């Protein structure tokens, strides 16, 4: 006590093999307007400096969520520890709009979803490429909720990613506002209802910008999601699929906005792992 030393007091699962974890470090970079952005960079297990590896960009929910330094081996929709053990690097940025960086930063995405936040994120991707870690020809993007929104938005704005995983995403800001259990959420962010500024709502909706998307896309959505109704997932899935772009939709029976059944969470984790291995590591 008082020395900040770590002391092992028990080891309940000593008989189980210990899975290796990738090194995680805090990364900082400048966005296009000079704003400093912070995030977490996870290296593949056994990473050799100077080697370029597949990069996965994970975008958090919220938008007021935040990535924190914490144990990487917990279960979640995206199996980050497994990704690292399979040779992927992982970037988890905290773009403008994230919590924990002050009020001005928290509200810097007002009326600007898909604007400054997108540029913050892409500047982080460029930084990892500049570091000689990410292979620019083998990059994937993924996220749940607002992270799913940003994932679907990202692939309407750039063709740099070879695969995307869109989870429980808001993809049509107009129809979302009329069907979600939080009808006032987007009006608070956009300064009015869709009928007050239909042009802005449409301009920032991935569905309205989906023409020309070529990124293979996995859409995942809970059938019982009332926060972001499953129709949002179907809208984007159909927009991508009808253009001839590879697309799959995983419907999760009984699941709300955040999946709660262990077997469903396991299904999501395995599906995401398989999806990115298929598209970023062909032949593996």
What do the predicted segments below correspond to?
Residues 1-284:
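Serine-hydrolase catalytic core recognition
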């Amino acid at each position: 006590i008082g020395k900040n030393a770590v002391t092992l007091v028990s080891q309940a699962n000593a008989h189980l093999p210990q899975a290796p974890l990738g090194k995680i470090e805090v990364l900082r970079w400048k966005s296009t307007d000079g704003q400093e952005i912070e995030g977490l960079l996870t290296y593949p297990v056994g990473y050799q400096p100077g080697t370029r590896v597949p990069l996965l960009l994970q975008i958090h929910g919220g938008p007021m969520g935040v990535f924190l330094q914490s144990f990487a081996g917990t279960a979640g929709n995206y199996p980050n520890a497994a990704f690292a053990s399979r040779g992927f690097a992982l970037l988890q940025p905290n773009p403008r709009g994230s919590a924990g960086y002050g009020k001005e930063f928290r509200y810097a995405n007002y009326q600007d979803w898909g604007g400054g936040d997108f540029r913050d994120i892409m500047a982080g991707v460029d930084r990892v490429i500049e570091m000689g870690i990410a292979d620019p020809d083998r990059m994937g993007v993924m996220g749940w909720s607002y992270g799913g929104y940003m994932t679907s938005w990202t692939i309407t704005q750039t063709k740099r990613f070879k695969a995307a995983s869109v989870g429980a995403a808001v993809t049509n800001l107009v129809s979302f506002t009329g069907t979600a259990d939080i009808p006032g959420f987007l009006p608070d962010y956009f300064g009015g209802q869709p009928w007050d500024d239909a042009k802005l709502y449409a301009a920032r909706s991935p569905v309205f910008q989906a023409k020309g998307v070529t990124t293979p896309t996995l859409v995942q959505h809970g059938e019982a999601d009332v926060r972001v109704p499953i129709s949002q997932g179907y809208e984007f899935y159909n927009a991508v699929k009808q253009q001839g772009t590879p697309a799959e939709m995983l419907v999760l029976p009984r699941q709300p906005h955040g999946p709660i059944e262990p077997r469903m969470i396991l299904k999501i984790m395995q599906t995401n792992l398989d999806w990115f291995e298929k598209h970023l590591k062909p032949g593996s």
